[in-house]
From Swiss-Prot:
Pfam families: BTB_BTBDG (PF23998), BTBD16_C (PF21059). The lineage of its organism: Eukaryota, Metazoa, Chordata, Craniata, Vertebrata. This is BTB/POZ domain-containing protein 16. Residues 166-222 form the BTB domain. SUPFAM superfamilies: POZ domain. It comes from Mus musculus (Mouse). It comes from the Eukaryota.
Amino acid sequence: MKMLNSVSGSFRKKAGDSRSRECRTRLERRIVGATNRWRFPQDHFCGDLLALSQMCNVLNVDLDEALKNPDRLCISKFQKLFSENIMNSGTQSGEADVILECLGFKWELHHPQIFQSGTLAKLYLTALIQNMKSSQRELDKVQKAHPSGKIKKRSPVKKIIISMRINDPAVTRVAFALALKNLYMKEVEMTVDNVLGVLASAHILQFNRLFQKCVNMMMNRLAPSTIKNFYLAGCKYEEEQLTMACEKWLAMNLVPLVGTQIHLRQIPEPLLYKVLKSPRLFTFSEFHLLKTLLMWVYLQMNCKVQMVPIHETILAFFNSFPKKCCFLEQDPGQNWMPLFLCLRLHGITSGKDLEVLKHINFFPESWLVRVTANHYHALESGGNMVHLKDLSTQAMRFGLLFRQEYTTYSERISIYGYFFEIKGIKHDPTSYSFSMQRIKHTDLECPSPVCEHSTISLRSERLVKYEIQAQTLVDGRWQEFRTNQIMQKFGFIKPGCKSHVLKIQTVGIPIYASFAFIFPAS
């Protein structure tokens, strides 16, 4: 009794460290044995000598030996011990010896398999201990009734019945059946439609191998139609590996893929915010990113729309709001202000695009005044972006999506009268290179949307700070390649007109190539 009191006292001391920790620990306690004493399930041996003794009786293990190293009796060891005892006794057969009552069904199982599930193992051990007590009481009664007579041969051991209640609506009978099937087979086919239910079943069953299998499948099946549910599942089960995979995938595909489909509506706002803040975010230009975000807001406010709206429809919708203040300062838009603060509006330099920003009455006037003032000062100083310092968070950003059918692909851009060509080249099936080059305005085809509404700089050199990066998905993992942050003067004559070349070797396709740069003062 002194030993039990001292052990109990030590638990009270640990649990009293802080109020929050105490509350959390109480929620995790469970009852063990006939004495209804509390124990902590996360510990292998918690000082409960009676429970340890009961386990030793079931496993036919010497109590004195178990006390020398009680942790060896953790559940992960039970399967091996039970299997050895069954094989030695010669009672192993193919007949099910465990009945699981769950979801209105009775599932026939075998105890060697259920030890892959922490939940089923605990239920089984609890039921087994209770059966041992009941059998012992029956044997004592028989011995008292026939002290000197012969005792009839005992009937075969009854099947052990365990029951479990599941309240998670994600767990369907089909999904639960697939989870139990995985106890017996390593390769059980799952689909995108039922993987969430199997994941929920694996979580409840504490079936780690199956849970990880579901996570791996979900990471490899990310698509516009699945990204929402897979991300929410990762948050629900605190599976950082899955949530990070969703964030990385969406950072690459928000603009080029999801932003072109009605599934954009389903993207949760917290996920969208993380992606907009990500330095890995891919976009063709800042205006492309703005259009994607405007469409997301439009779809949130027009839930009945089932077709992807054209850009003019979205602009007309926001322009229809009262002109007394901008959309982001009115009730519907105030909650989305943090999303638009992630945009780099200074990266929108086209006169035509700036006119769009002004006329849709979406942004606060102070934002537009600041953007316009920065553009004016940059043009006045020959392109110097004195208001931009950090390349990773403030740079102008442009992108190329290099697809499988391309051998070469390029786009031309104009900033403050300077013209550049960003280009990707495929040298062989696994070798690519990406670079940027300054070009003359006379090299552009006229009329050209690049030079339309654009000024022309006659300066022979332009100091540029830039970085080129490329990302692609290979076997479920993102490969990333990048240059350092490079400071270089770009002229019109080779080799001074061309940037450093990013050369990569990969089997991944498509390749998301991003170009970020600013014009330092010169």
